[in-house]
């Protein structure tokens, strides 16, 4: 686990009080110049940086993440800065954006951003209206920002020097480390989705060879979808950290809105095609569990192994009773494919997999290790066959009924019984190509097994595989 944590350097030049006062004065002059020249809303960004050092690797990271989040927000709002000034000075990081947006609207958005992720607590996002008036939280009947260390009024703690500088710097380091960790997890999920998509040949599925049984998507569609989802998986980890104080049965309702936003982003880049809806659900739960465990100190920097059982157990707790929603689905709500398949066949799909703690994956991981002498992709193809052989894949049933599921499972089982074929990659590839053709002819696609394969790849990445 150690390789997922970064310790940022706090080394830097100490700045004199005179230099800091001069920088503050220059900042005020520049703000007034921009307001006078452009007569529009001004956003000014600085950082919470205690002590004599105002610029180092730690604060560089915090500033970079502030700019990344603001850029993403501007893109989402479809607004472009009239004027932009970025100044990573030794006296402290500064950024200025003159924006064509109502000041009060922007202030509300900045407050939401400040409260959206833990790292944002380190960003000072000041909004001035066209008249040069600084908008504050009290203008919106909101309480002042809280202290990094104790959670009390931040201004009072600063004024009374309640906390030692080292204590505050340690807290900043912790926030940065946790955010960086969340981004590493998001990156690992993205890489797992890409590996799964490119793995070839995969019977009936989109891969690097063909589109399988799909006429509305290809490998590029999957790759673009995975790119769009990467920041959301980071957000799920952060959400897990932020909700660590809640009980497990409250978590699902807390993360559902984020899952819907992820789906919306996916549909936007795929022109309405469902590439990763199941993966959003599964990985969203897993990432949230990881964030929760980190916040509760169950995962520590000195940890060597990533405990898949612990993660899956927590997911099971999050989703306890989830399949009951299928049993008691309200008649007035529009029916979904998952609901119809449960009502007709009793299949619980991805909901059931999550509720049982992804037991299928945990069962197959030892089998993956049995083929340690084989190359990585060869082992993944064998793993996919094992998943297809035993997974009651609702994607398959949706396309081909129970007969289609029986065909997929029986064919996969037959291939796995021939150990010579399984361990000979050339022979296995040829057999999978024939299986692929048969799936395409029957319009069958094991999308559920593909999602479980991606999740397994993700789990394996923590073992150094």
Curated annotation (Swiss-Prot):
Which portions of the sequence form the region 2-(5''-triphosphoribosyl)-3'-dephosphocoenzyme-A synthase?
183-465
- Enzyme Commission identifier(s): 2.7.7.61, 2.4.2.52
Q: Per the record, which residues fall in region Apo-citrate lyase phosphoribosyl-dephospho-CoA transferase?
A: 1-182
What Pfam families does this protein's entry cite?
A: CitG, CitX
Enzyme class, UniProt record, top EC level: transferase
Q: Which Gene3D superfamilies does this entry report, sorted A to Z?
A: Triphosphoribosyl-dephospho-CoA protein (1.10.4200.10)
Q: What does the UniProt keyword field contain?
A: ATP-binding, Multifunctional enzyme, Nucleotide-binding, Nucleotidyltransferase, Transferase
A single MF term (Gene Ontology): ATP binding
Enzymatic reactions: apo-[citrate lyase ACP] + 2'-(5''-triphospho-alpha-D-ribosyl)-3'-dephospho-CoA = holo-[citrate lyase ACP] + diphosphate; 3'-dephospho-CoA + ATP = 2'-(5''-triphospho-alpha-D-ribosyl)-3'-dephospho-CoA + adenine
> Would you kindly state one Gene Ontology biological process term found in this protein's UniProt entry?
prosthetic group biosynthetic process
Q: List the disulfide bonds.
A: none
* Superkingdom as given in the UniProt entry: Bacteria
Q: Matching NCBIfam families, A to Z? A: citrate_citG, citrate_citX
What protein family is recorded? In the N-terminal section; belongs to the CitX family.
Q: What does this protein do?
A: Bifunctional enzyme that catalyzes formation of 2-(5''-triphosphoribosyl)-3'-dephosphocoenzyme-A, and then the transfer of this prosthetic group precursor to the apo-acyl carrier protein (gamma chain) of the citrate lyase to yield the holo-acyl carrier protein.
Protein name (database record): Protein CitXG
């Amino acid at each position: 686990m150690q390789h997922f944590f970064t310790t940022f350097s706090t080394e830097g030049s100490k700045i004199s009080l005179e230099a800091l006062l001069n920088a503050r004065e220059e900042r005020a002059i520049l703000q007034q110049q921009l307001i006078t020249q452009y007569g529009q809303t001004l956003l000014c960004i600085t950082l919470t940086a205690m002590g004599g050092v105002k610029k180092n690797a730690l604060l560089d990271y915090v500033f970079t993440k502030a700019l990344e989040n603001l850029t993403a927000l501007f893109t989402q709002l479809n607004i472009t800065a009239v004027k932009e000034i970025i100044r990573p000075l030794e006296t402290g990081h500064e950024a200025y954006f003159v924006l064509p947006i109502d000041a009060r609207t922007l202030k509300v958005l900045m407050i939401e951003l400040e409260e959206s992720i833990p790292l944002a607590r380190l960003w000072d996002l000041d909004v001035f209206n066209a008249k040069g008036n600084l908008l504050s939280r009290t203008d919106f009947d909101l309480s002042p920002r809280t202290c990094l260390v104790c959670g009390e009024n931040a201004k009072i703690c600063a004024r009374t020097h309640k906390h030692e500088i080292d204590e505050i710097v340690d807290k900043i380091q912790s926030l940065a480390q946790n955010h960086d960790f969340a981004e590493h997890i998001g990156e690992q999920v993205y890489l797992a989705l890409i590996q799964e998509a490119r793995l070839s040949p995969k019977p009936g599925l989109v891969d690097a060879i063909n589109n399988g049984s799909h006429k509305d998507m290809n490998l590029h569609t999957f790759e673009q979808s995975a790119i769009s989802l990467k920041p959301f998986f980071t957000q799920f980890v952060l959400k897990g950290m932020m909700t660590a104080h809640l009980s497990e049965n409250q978590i699902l309702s807390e993360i559902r809105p984020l899952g819907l936003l992820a789906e919306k982003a996916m549909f936007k880049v795929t022109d309405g095609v469902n590439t990763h809806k199941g993966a959003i659900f599964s990985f969203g739960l897993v990432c949230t569990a990881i964030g929760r465990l980190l916040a509760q100190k169950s995962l520590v920097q000195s940890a060597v192994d990533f405990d898949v059982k612990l993660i899956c157990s927590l997911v099971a707790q999050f989703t306890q009773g989830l399949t009951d929603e299928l049993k008691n689905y309200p008649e007035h709500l529009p029916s979904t494919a998952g609901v119809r398949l449960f009502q007709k066949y009793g299949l619980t799909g991805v909901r059931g997999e999550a509720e049982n703690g992804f037991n299928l994956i945990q069962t197959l991981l030892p089998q993956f290790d049995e083929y340690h002498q084989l190359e990585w992709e060869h082992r993944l193809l064998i793993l996919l066959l094992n998943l297809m052989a035993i997974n009651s894949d609702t994607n398959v049933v949706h396309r081909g009924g129970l007969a289609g599921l029986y065909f997929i499972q029986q064919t996969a089982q037959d291939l796995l019984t021939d150990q010579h074929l399984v361990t000979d990659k050339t022979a296995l590839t040829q057999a999978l190509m024939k299986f692929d053709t048969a799936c395409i002819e029957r319009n069958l696609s094991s999308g559920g097994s593909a999602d479980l394969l991606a999740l397994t790849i993700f789990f394996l990445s923590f073992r150094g595989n």
